[in-house]
């Protein structure tokens, strides 16, 4: 029975991918095209297995080859084969893309949940508002004429206490007293005391 052994990379043995990567590091466009043609199916396949989306896989593969163009000089033939280096770049970039998409999705979920207004029942709100108005009008009827008149001028017409006292030709202290008594009467009538 024979034991399976790992393939051994012999030091300083160069392949044509090694040569192409060195040429890409020197900004050789033709070498980059040749490297791309020879490796794209494996790189794209690795990315697609991680991302499972053809569109994202194409974008990510493009990013990987841009990174290869920019950093081909960092490839060390003693550390492994050119294909292993490319597939490591591909895997890392694909995993980064997955993490980025998940983070974006979580941000959108948090933002969406925080910015969605709860549904409003306009009919129910209108009915409640009409009922509250009716109750206030009924309670206003329980006040004295002087209290009701002072409250109407202040709260419905927007006059200040001084303006109410001038309009009614009454002392400011008297108007304040009528207002306090009227508000107390409204609170009692509305059950807010």
From Swiss-Prot:
Keywords: DNA-binding, Sigma factor, Transcription, Transcription regulation
Membrane-spanning parts: none
Ranges for region Sigma-70 factor domain-4: 140-187
Coiled-coil regions listed: none
Segments for region (Sigma-70 factor domain-2): 35-101
Gene3D superfamilies in alphabetical order: 1.10.1740.10, Winged helix-like DNA-binding domain superfamily/Winged helix DNA-binding domain (1.10.10.10)
InterPro entries: RNA_pol_sigma-70-like, RNA_pol_sigma-70_dom, RNA_pol_sigma70_r2, RNA_pol_sigma70_r4, RNA_pol_sigma_r2, RNA_pol_sigma_r3/r4-like, WH-like_DNA-bd_sf
Gene Ontology biological process terms, A to Z: DNA-templated transcription initiation
Highest taxon listed in the record's lineage: Bacteria
Annotation: DNA-binding region: 161-180
Keyword Transport listed: no
Entry annotated with the keyword Isomerase: no
Span(s) of short sequence motif Polymerase core binding: 59-62
Any GO molecular function: DNA binding
Pfam families registered for this protein in UniProt: Sigma70_r2 (PF04542), Sigma70_r4 (PF04545)
Additional remarks: Extracytoplasmic function (ECF) sigma factors are held in an inactive form by an anti-sigma factor until released by regulated intramembrane proteolysis (RIP). RIP occurs when an extracytoplasmic signal triggers a concerted proteolytic cascade to transmit information and elicit cellular responses. The membrane-spanning anti-sigma factor is first cut extracytoplasmically (site-1 protease, S1P), then within the membrane itself (site-2 protease, S2P, Rip1), while cytoplasmic proteases finish degrading the regulatory protein, liberating SigK.
Family: Belongs to the sigma-70 factor family. ECF subfamily.
Cited function: Sigma factors are initiation factors that promote the attachment of RNA polymerase to specific initiation sites and are then released. Extracytoplasmic function (ECF) sigma factors are held in an inactive form by an anti-sigma factor until released by regulated intramembrane proteolysis.
Domains as described in the record: The sigma-70 factor domain-2 mediates sequence-specific interaction with the -10 element in promoter DNA, and plays an important role in melting the double-stranded DNA and the formation of the transcription bubble. The sigma-70 factor domain-2 mediates interaction with the RNA polymerase subunits RpoB and RpoC.
Subunit organization: Interacts transiently with the RNA polymerase catalytic core formed by RpoA, RpoB, RpoC and RpoZ (2 alpha, 1 beta, 1 beta' and 1 omega subunit) to form the RNA polymerase holoenzyme that can initiate transcription. Interacts (via sigma-70 factor domain 4) with anti-sigma-K factor RskA.
Name of protein: ECF RNA polymerase sigma factor SigK
């Amino acid at each position: 029975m024979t034991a399976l052994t790992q393939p051994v990379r012999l030091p300083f043995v160069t392949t044509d991918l090694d040569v192409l990567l060195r040429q890409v590091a020197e900004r050789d466009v033709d070498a980059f095209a040749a490297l791309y043609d020879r490796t794209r199916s494996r790189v794209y396949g690795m990315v697609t297995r991680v991302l499972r989306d053809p569109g994202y896989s194409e974008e990510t593969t493009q990013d990987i080859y841009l990174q290869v163009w920019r950093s081909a000089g960092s490839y060390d033939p003693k550390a492994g084969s050119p294909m292993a280096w490319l597939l490591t770049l591909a895997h890392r970039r694909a995993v980064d893309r997955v993490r980025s998409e998940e983070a974006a999705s979580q941000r959108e979920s948090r933002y969406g949940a925080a910015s969605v207004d709860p549904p409003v029942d306009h009919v129910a709100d209108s009915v409640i508002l009409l009922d509250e108005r009716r109750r206030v009008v009924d309670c206003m009827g329980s006040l004295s004429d002087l209290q009701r008149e002072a409250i109407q001028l202040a709260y419905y017409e927007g006059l200040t206490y001084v303006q109410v006292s001038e309009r009614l030709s009454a002392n400011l202290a008297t108007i304040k007293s009528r207002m306090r008594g009227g508000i107390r009467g409204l609170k009692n009538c509305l059950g807010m005391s």
